[in-house]
Amino acid sequence: DGTPTPDLWQLVVDTRLSHEQVLSDGERADYFTQALGYNLVQTAGGFAYSYSGGQGVKPVRDGLLFKEVAKREGTAPALISTAKAISQYEQEDVLDPIDAHQHYGNLKGSNQFASERVGIVAGSRHYGDDYVERWGALAEKSVEADRDEGRGMDLDYGEFGNKVLHHMREHEVLQAVLRFGRDGRGANIYVHTAALPEWVPVEAEGHIHVWGKGTLEIIRVLECDGPNRWRTRDVAEEVGITPRQARTNLGQLADAGYIEKEKEGRGFTWVVTDETIDRLGQVEFRSS
């Protein structure tokens, strides 16, 4: 077992079963990057993104990620997510940039993505409190979710319950990561969840920003057959928002490189460039 939880093995096999970790965490990290050739980019911003129930899935945001990964890598990536998330992606028609997709529950023993050089793992799994509580009952341990203290990555089931949580969440995400590039040639993998074991090395981070309604209205104005130089107040009047709101939204577009910001007098002039503005939003990648 590449991602063992010894307490669970002892429960179902034999209490005398012993576990010995052969490699240190540092050695495992080196093996992961140097021997297996994995390069991980994490795009979750610290969120678990538990997608098993489908409630937290945001197809527009995730679809923007799929599109930008394909653009960055120059090839269509393969995708692993939960069955309910994939169903929503299909309904919202955001899978065009994806080469092939599969859900977590259909990966056991699968080599479908063994030769894929680019992969995405979107969201993590959580089978519900009942799953953790059943393991607790089997082990005769008290297990209770303390959501007053935290949710997502801060969710706490107590000492034993947290071992079960990490087994179904972090370990399942890592197993999904290991589906890609199994032919020894490695892979670039984008992990859209914070649920990874702490020892797993992350080479870069991605930050996803979906444009709000105000920014979309400004994009519409800037793309019309009007001037290519705008003052903040003129944009605000066209869109029907305050100059402060216009300045904030224009600043986001400038930070993304879609327009240029020039200081003139006591205000700013915004210059429309030849860069095509993505109507969905922006994904920015940075080295960790």
Regions found by a protein language model. Name each.
Residues E73-Q88:
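Conserved strand-helix element at the start of the C-terminal RecA-like helicase core
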Residues A100-W199:
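Conserved RecA-like P-loop NTPase helicase motor core
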Residues K84-D99, Y258:
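Conserved helicase motor "Helicase C" RecA-like lobe of SF1/SF2 P-loop NTPases
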Residues G240-A254:
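Short amphipathic alpha-helical interaction segments
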Residues G2-P59:
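Interdomain hinge/linker at the junction between the two RecA-like core domains of SF2 helicases
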Residues A254-E264:
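A short, conserved structural fragment
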Residues P227-E238:
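Short acidic, hydrophobic short linear motifs in intrinsically disordered regions
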Residues E264-R286:
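Short, cationic-aromatic polyanion-contact patches
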